[in-house]
Amino acid sequence: VGDYLDIASWDSYPLGFLEDRVVASDEFKQAFARQGDPDFQAFHHDLYRTVGKGRWWVMEQQPGPVNWAPYNPSPLPGMIRLWSWEAFAHGAEAVCYFRWRQAPFAQEQMHAGLLRPDSADAPALAEAKEVAREIADAHSVEECLSEVALLFDYKSDWMWRILPQGRGLEYFNLIYDNYRALRGLGLSVDILSTEDDFSKHKLVVAPGLLYMSDDLKERLSKRDGPTVVGPRSGSSTENFGINRPLGPNLPNINVTTTRVETLRPDMPILLEGGGCVKGWSEALETSDTPFRIMANGDLAAVSTGNITYLGGWFDNEALTRAFNEICLTAEIKVIEMPEGLRRRATSKEMFWFNY
């Protein structure tokens, strides 16, 4: 769809989305109940920046309690300002608040606005005014090439939905886990399609790409920088059959997935050195260098040259360790961020957001 759009937009409801669609523990949701997930908004900003070919808006920004989530708390003071500036730091042309005035009737009468139902100022209005004043005095935010390209493929999303092979194994969650780990290392991320040019990015991450065209494989193999390919990649034909030869079938790395199993949430497979494989695990055959070994001795990931293949759905600890090691080897600067702190690089400034 994005090929035919002049501009893209999305609706940003950090507190509502934390409650009804972010996959996280109750402890995490309690800790960020009044702030939102520190990565969820940024992920969608980065995604729709690419869908809109650089031009995108926040069409609806949450200004207070909503009416549709399981629980609808008020944001902490300052969060409307933070969410607004975070959107601009990721390239938004506009942030529109939903809504102007809280309706005193009908099914959305409990949904907050910039004004109360009696037309008096609601708390969010002062923060929106503050952002407007700051924008007037600020430099224009000019985007720059991020260190990392994260490849996102809607066809793969459809394939995962048709054959997830296990409850809760969704392509979006796999992509998001990788994005969260990268951001936790202080990295800025461009979310690109498999057809976009990623040749100038320092690191390319490509998890869960069931179908990989010959052109994509060739472009990945010719990169000078590191490439991390994730589980299930290259396992399917374009028409959604099992690939022969078996996946991932990548140039420059000798690894074959011979069997796949999916795991209950309460039976993760521990990795040597920390972290685990959860949900999706592959049996790998290779003559190349092991990159990660499971605690039971089985192979979990393989690396040779600039290409690393992860043969399982790594948890956050395992992904963070892997990306940290790969970045240090490639001399890509990382900063392990404290919980809730994130940053975004632009051409002139580094933005820091404290959730």
Predicted regions located by residue number:
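A short, well-structured beta->alpha microelement
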Residues: 178-199
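Structural motif
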Residues: 7, 202-203, 226
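Hydrophobic targeting/anchoring helices
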Residues: 1-172, 176, 239, 255-273, ...
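A conserved amphipathic helix/loop scaffold
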Residues: 76, 207-355
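Short, flexible loop segments at the rims of nucleotide/cofactor-binding pockets, characterized by
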Residues: 33-37, 72-73, 181-187, 205-210, ...
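Alpha-helical scaffold elements within enzyme catalytic domains, especially in hydrolases
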Residues: 47, 86, 181, 219-222, ...
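Hydrophobic, well-ordered secondary-structure elements that form the walls
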Residues: 87, 148, 189, 204, ...
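Hydrophobic anchor at the start of a short beta-strand
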Residues: 56, 95, 189, 227, ...
